[in-house]
C-alpha cells in the first residue's frame, strides 16, 4: 500500500510511524487490497481533532481517529465499474486523522500498551475507510472480530 504520513504535530517518533505503516500494510493484506491502494494518515493534536470533529461531525470533543472514506462510484461518473483496473489507476480509500494524545489517554484508561492502542486506532479507522462500521449490531459483529483478528495476528494482543 502507498501510505502517506503527515505529522502536523512534528513530534511523532519514527518508531511509531513505522508501527503505523506496518499495521496498516498488514491490515491491507488481510483485506486483500491491491498493493497500489493509497491512503493518508495525518497526526494532529487533541485540539485539532476536536475542531475537525466539531466541523464534520458536530461533536465538540477530541477523539482518537476520524476517518474520511473516499466512496467514489465510477458508474455514477459514467465510467466502467472496474475503472481503476482498466486504466491502472491506484484506488485511494481515504484519509485518517489521528490524535496520539488521545490514543495515549485511552491506553492508560484501558490498561494496555500505547502500541496496542495505536494499532487499534489505526486498524479501526482503516476498517471504516474500507466500508466497515459498528453502529448497527449486524455491522458490529463483522467489524469488531475482524479488527481483533488483525491486531492479534499482527502481534498486538490485549
From Swiss-Prot:
Subcellular location(s) of the protein: Cytoplasm
Coiled coil residues, start to end: none
Cofactor note: Binds 1 zinc ion.
Entry's Gene Ontology molecular function annotations: metalloendopeptidase activity; RNA endonuclease activity; zinc ion binding
Chain positions recorded as Zn(2+) binding sites: 124, 128, 134
UniProt-listed PANTHER family: ENDORIBONUCLEASE YBEY, CHLOROPLASTIC
Family: Belongs to the endoribonuclease YbeY family.
Protein name: Endoribonuclease YbeY
Species: Latilactobacillus sakei subsp. sakei (strain 23K) (Lactobacillus sakei subsp. sakei)
Amino acid at each position: 500500500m502507498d501510505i502517506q504520513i503527515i505529522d502536523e504535530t512534528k513530534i511523532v517518533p519514527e518508531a511509531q510511524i513505522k508501527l503505523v505503516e506496518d499495521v496498516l500494510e498488514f491490515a491491507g493484506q488481510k483485506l486483500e487490497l491491491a498493493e497500489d491502494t493509497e491512503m493518508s494518515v495525518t497526526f494532529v493534536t487533541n485540539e485539532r481533532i476536536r475542531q475537525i470533529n466539531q466541523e464534520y461531525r458536530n461533536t465538540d470533543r477530541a477523539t482518537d481517529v476520524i476517518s474520511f472514506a473516499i466512496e467514489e462510484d465510477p458508474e455514477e461518473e459514467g465510467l466502467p465499474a472496474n475503472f481503476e483496473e482498466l486504466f491502472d489507476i491506484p484506488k485511494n480509500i481515504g484519509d485518517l486523522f489521528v490524535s496520539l494524545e488521545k490514543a495515549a489517554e485511552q491506553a492508560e484508561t484501558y490498561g494496555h500498551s500505547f502500541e496496542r492502542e495505536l494499532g487499534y486506532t489505526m486498524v479501526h479507522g482503516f476498517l471504516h475507510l474500507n466500508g466497515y462500521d459498528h453502529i448497527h449490531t449486524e455491522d458490529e459483529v463483522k467489524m469488531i472480530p475482524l479488527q481483533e483478528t488483525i491486531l492479534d495476528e499482527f502481534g498486538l494482543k490485549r
